[in-house]
């Protein structure tokens, strides 16, 4: 890695110091980078800015954004659907859930590198061999490599083409999450209180890995050098996996404790009166208020003022139905 890429960027508002090499989009697909930059340029035209993140974990960023924009910025995270599973188990879940039921508590390393596999064949071979040599129990989701990996990995793990990730992460036998650090997977791991073994590949995954390892301190990196061409060897993988899943290791105990603390913050955020629920309610109130104002403006513009009183009353009644269960907070409190 060149000395230039090791330089730290410390002038982005709300973001802690970060090496230049970890900045998303640097030196990668230029066409894709241009599309992302174009999407970012639309933000200034927005009426609202919604994030599936939690204020408590990124308060500096949210404070900067709320100060910069004249429109409301809402933190609505983690927004994970169907977290309360109950007894709703699909029949195709039964085999791997039964396998998990038979494993010791916190003994399984769950591995998922996203829906769009960008890991090279050589790296996949090293990962499989490293897992086999580590002797650690694992559960690996690999859509297109299932048959091959079953042969290579040995009998200590289970390889499947698909699973209900939230159901697996919330299982008592799962003690670690080898993740590509996509934002959806990151949110789910946080909500389940699982420590991360990060393996970012591209774009925002790199920054998410930084948050996990350096800011929140709830995991380790598998890859120290970012980039698809940087191969992590089977020897290094076996060593890291063994240490990561060692429940008696003091360093491991520390980040497992912090992962549990992160889980509690997530649970408070989505609970009644939490930051996430408060933001969602404020957004709904703002939105319903704007609907009434815009409708009145449209009626006035068309010169139909005489027929609008009963119509306005009906519209206002409809918007109140959205928030009929409880009084909502004053939206002005969340705008800046």
List each language-model region with its residue ranges.
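Polybasic, low-complexity terminal segments and linkers that are predominantly intrinsically disordered
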Residues: 300-336
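Short glycine/proline-centered loop/turn elements that form peptide/ligand docking sites
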Residues: 185, 196-198, 202-203
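Nucleotide-sugar-dependent glycosyltransferase catalytic domains
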Residues: 1-167, 176, 192, 201-216, ...
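Acidic donor-binding loop of glycosyltransferase active sites
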Residues: 157-158, 172-185, 194
């Amino acid at each position: 890695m060149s000395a230039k890429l090791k330089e730290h960027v410390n002038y982005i508002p709300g973001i802690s110091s970060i090496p230049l090499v970890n900045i998303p989009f640097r030196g990668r697909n230029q066409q894709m980078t241009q599309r992302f930059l174009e999407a970012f340029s639309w933000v200034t035209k927005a009426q609202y800015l919604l994030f599936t993140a939690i204020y408590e974990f990124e308060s500096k960023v949210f404070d900067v954004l709320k100060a910069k924009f004249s429109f409301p910025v809402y933190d609505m995270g983690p927004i994970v659907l169907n977290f309360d599973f109950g007894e709703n188990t699909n029949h195709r879940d039964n085999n791997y859930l039964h396998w998990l039921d038979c494993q010791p508590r916190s003994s399984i390393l769950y591995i998922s590198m996203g829906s769009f596999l960008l890991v090279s064949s050589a790296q996949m071979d090293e990962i499989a061999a490293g897992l086999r040599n580590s002797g650690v129990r694992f559960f690996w989701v690999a859509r297109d490599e299932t048959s091959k990996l079953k042969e290579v990995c040995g009998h200590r793990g289970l390889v499947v083409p698909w699973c209900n990730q939230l159901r697996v992460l919330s299982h008592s036998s799962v003690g670690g999450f080898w993740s590509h650090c996509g934002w959806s997977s990151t949110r789910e791991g946080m909500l389940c209180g699982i420590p991360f073994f990060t393996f970012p590949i591209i774009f925002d995954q790199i920054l998410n890995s930084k948050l996990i390892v350096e800011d929140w301190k709830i995991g380790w990196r598998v890859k120290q050098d970012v980039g698809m061409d940087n191969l992590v060897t089977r020897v290094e993988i076996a060593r890291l996996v063994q240490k990561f899943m060692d429940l008696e290791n003091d360093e491991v105990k520390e980040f497992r404790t912090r992962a549990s603390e992160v889980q509690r913050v997530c649970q408070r955020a989505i609970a009644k009166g939490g930051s996430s629920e408060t933001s969602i309610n404020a957004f709904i109130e703002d939105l319903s208020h704007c609907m009434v104002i815009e409708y009145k403006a449209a009626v006035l513009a068309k010169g139909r003022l005489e027929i609008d009183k009963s119509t306005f009353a009906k519209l206002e009644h409809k918007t109140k139905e959205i928030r009929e269960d409880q009084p909502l907070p004053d939206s002005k409190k969340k705008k800046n």
